[in-house]
């Protein structure tokens, strides 16, 4: 059976592993998921990620990040644009997550960008997810 929304599956697996205080989570690999993981790493929400060749396909292994007393670095993840209802934003109307404390991940013609990077470059696109 094919997966309807692989990005929502990626975010749900991260959310569940984070809630259970797992150190890492293994996911099916895709370029889009690797790019989202790169944004999460650059913004400080995860410590690292790597790609491994599995018996069937590739796997993306994400190492979650916690504070000194095991407080979570990811407080929340939310899928915004879904297969049944796509959400787009112009460069002049980009969303701000928690007044700038969180990050919106936006798929643009320049690749995946955060809301701040997209505003700086003056591009809009599909709002994939919010992370805070």
Swiss-Prot record:
<dbReference type="InterPro" id="IPR000630">
    <property type="entry name" value="Ribosomal_uS8"/>
</dbReference>
<dbReference type="Pfam" id="PF00410">
    <property type="entry name" value="Ribosomal_S8"/>
</dbReference>
<dbReference type="InterPro" id="IPR047863">
    <property type="entry name" value="Ribosomal_uS8_CS"/>
</dbReference>
<dbReference type="GO" id="GO:0006412">
    <property type="term" value="P:translation"/>
</dbReference>
<dbReference type="GO" id="GO:0019843">
    <property type="term" value="F:rRNA binding"/>
</dbReference>
<dbReference type="GO" id="GO:0003735">
    <property type="term" value="F:structural constituent of ribosome"/>
</dbReference>
<keyword id="KW-0689">Ribosomal protein</keyword>
<comment type="function">
    <text>One of the primary rRNA binding proteins, it binds directly to 16S rRNA central domain where it helps coordinate assembly of the platform of the 30S subunit.</text>
</comment>
<dbReference type="GO" id="GO:0005840">
    <property type="term" value="C:ribosome"/>
</dbReference>
<comment type="similarity">
    <text>Belongs to the universal ribosomal protein uS8 family.</text>
</comment>
<keyword id="KW-0694">RNA-binding</keyword>
<keyword id="KW-0699">rRNA-binding</keyword>
<keyword id="KW-0687">Ribonucleoprotein</keyword>
<comment type="subunit">
    <text>Part of the 30S ribosomal subunit. Contacts proteins S5 and S12.</text>
</comment>
<dbReference type="InterPro" id="IPR035987">
    <property type="entry name" value="Ribosomal_uS8_sf"/>
</dbReference>
<dbReference type="GO" id="GO:1990904">
    <property type="term" value="C:ribonucleoprotein complex"/>
</dbReference>
<protein>
    <recommendedName>
        <fullName>Small ribosomal subunit protein uS8</fullName>
    </recommendedName>
</protein>
């Amino acid at each position: 059976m094919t997966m309807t929304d692989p990005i929502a599956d990626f975010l749900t697996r991260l959310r569940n592993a984070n809630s259970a205080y797992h150190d890492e989570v293994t996911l099916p690999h895709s370029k889009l998921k690797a790019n989202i993981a790169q944004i999460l790493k650059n913004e400080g929400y995860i410590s690292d990620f790597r790609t491994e060749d599995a018996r069937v396909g590739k796997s993306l292994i994400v190492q979650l990040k916690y504070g000194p007393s095991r407080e979570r670095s990811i407080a929340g993840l939310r899928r915004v644009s879904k297969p049944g209802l796509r959400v787009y934003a112009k460069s002049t109307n980009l969303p701000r997550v928690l007044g700038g404390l969180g990050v919106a991940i936006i798929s643009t013609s320049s690749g995946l960008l955060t809301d701040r990077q997209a505003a700086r470059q003056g591009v809009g696109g599909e709002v994939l997810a919010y992370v805070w």
